[in-house]
């Protein structure tokens, strides 16, 4: 039985429709990864061979590669590790720790107080040449009130040392004056020197004290 030209095989129609050129069907988005796979990708580093993020980092794609190529200044500050502690306040770059009070200029030298303690104990049984009442009187006139007798005796010792140095300098000037005048021919161990104002004036000038010989009136 012959078939007319208008007739078509119903089974061949779908095949011809499939082979005919046409727009490509839209590609569906990949399904979301399971939670276990996402956890593995997050835990594995990008540089680990065979890790889930290795392909993305090697290919230059993905968030890990973008993070690696990001400039250092745009990255966040590196957090302090759990084992390390933040530098204390007052620490400087060379590793020397300075107290905050020392950084403000309140620098106090550390001196051993043992010799001073022994010296103060000796002052309790020492009687200076200048009486304590005299030293205390002039301290009160200067506006300083010392209740500790050891402080008064310490100031008395300082005054004695100052007067002794001036007297020794005046004596040296007197000896030099006697040597220059030629009176050193008669050498005697029992010779006594009389200090005058001419001997005291140059000795005091060395300490910044200027004195003048008083005028003599007849």
UniProtKB/Swiss-Prot annotation:
Residues 48-62 have a biased composition (Gly residues). Residues 1-21, 29-39 have a biased composition (Low complexity). The modification Phosphoserine is found at residue 44. One of its GO terms (molecular function) is nuclear estrogen receptor binding. The modification Allysine is found at residue 189. Residues 1-85 are annotated as: Disordered. Belongs to the TAF10 family. The modification Phosphothreonine is found at residue 48. The gene is TAF10. The modification N6,N6,N6-trimethyllysine is found at residue 189. Pfam families: TAF10. It comes from the Eukaryota. InterPro entries: TAF10. Keywords: Acetylation, Methylation, Nucleus, Phosphoprotein, Transcription, Transcription regulation. The TFIID basal transcription factor complex plays a major role in the initiation of RNA polymerase II (Pol II)-dependent transcription. TFIID recognizes and binds promoters with or without a TATA box via its subunit TBP, a TATA-box-binding protein, and promotes assembly of the pre-initiation complex (PIC). The TFIID complex consists of TBP and TBP-associated factors (TAFs), including TAF1, TAF2, TAF3, TAF4, TAF5, TAF6, TAF7, TAF8, TAF9, TAF10, TAF11, TAF12 and TAF13. One of its GO terms (cellular component) is transcription factor TFIID complex. Monomethylated at Lys-189 by SETD7, leading to increased affinity for RNA polymerase II. Lysine deamination at Lys-189 to form allysine is mediated by LOXL2. Allysine formation by LOXL2 results in release of TAF10 from promoters, leading to inhibition of TFIID-dependent transcription. Component of the TFIID basal transcription factor complex, composed of TATA-box-binding protein TBP, and a number of TBP-associated factors (TAFs), including TAF1, TAF2, TAF3, TAF4, TAF5, TAF6, TAF7, TAF8, TAF9, TAF10, TAF11, TAF12 and TAF13. Component of the TATA-binding protein-free TAF complex (TFTC), the PCAF histone acetylase complex and the STAGA transcription coactivator-HAT complex. The PCAF complex consists at least of TADA2L/ADA2, TADA3L/ADA3, SUPT3H, TAF5L TAF6L, TAF9, TAF10, TAF12 and TRRAP. A motif ([KR]-[STA]-K motif) lies at residues 187-189. This is Transcription initiation factor TFIID subunit 10.
């Amino acid at each position: 039985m012959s078939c007319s030209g208008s007739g078509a095989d119903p089974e061949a129609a779908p095949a011809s429709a499939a082979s005919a050129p046409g727009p490509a069907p839209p590609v569906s988005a990949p399904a979301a990864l399971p939670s276990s796979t996402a956890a593995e990708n997050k835990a594995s580093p990008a540089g680990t061979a065979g890790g889930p993020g290795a392909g993305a980092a090697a290919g230059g794609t993905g968030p890990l590669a973008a993070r690696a190529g990001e400039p250092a200044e745009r990255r966040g500050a590196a957090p302090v590790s759990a084992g390390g502690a933040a530098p204390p306040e007052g620490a400087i770059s060379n590793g020397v720790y300075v107290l905050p009070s020392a950084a403000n200029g309140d620098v106090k030298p550390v001196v051993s107080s043992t010799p001073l303690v022994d010296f103060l104990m000796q002052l309790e049984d020492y009687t200076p040449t200048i009486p304590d009442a005299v030293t205390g009187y002039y301290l009160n006139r200067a506006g300083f009130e010392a209740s500790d007798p050891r402080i008064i005796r310490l100031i008395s010792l300082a005054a004695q040392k100052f007067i002794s140095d001036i007297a020794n300098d005046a004596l040296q000037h007197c000896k030099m004056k006697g040597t220059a005048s030629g009176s050193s021919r008669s050498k005697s161990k029992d010779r006594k020197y009389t200090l005058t104002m001419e001997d005291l004036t140059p000795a005091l000038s060395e300490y910044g004290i200027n004195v003048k010989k008083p005028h003599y009136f007849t």
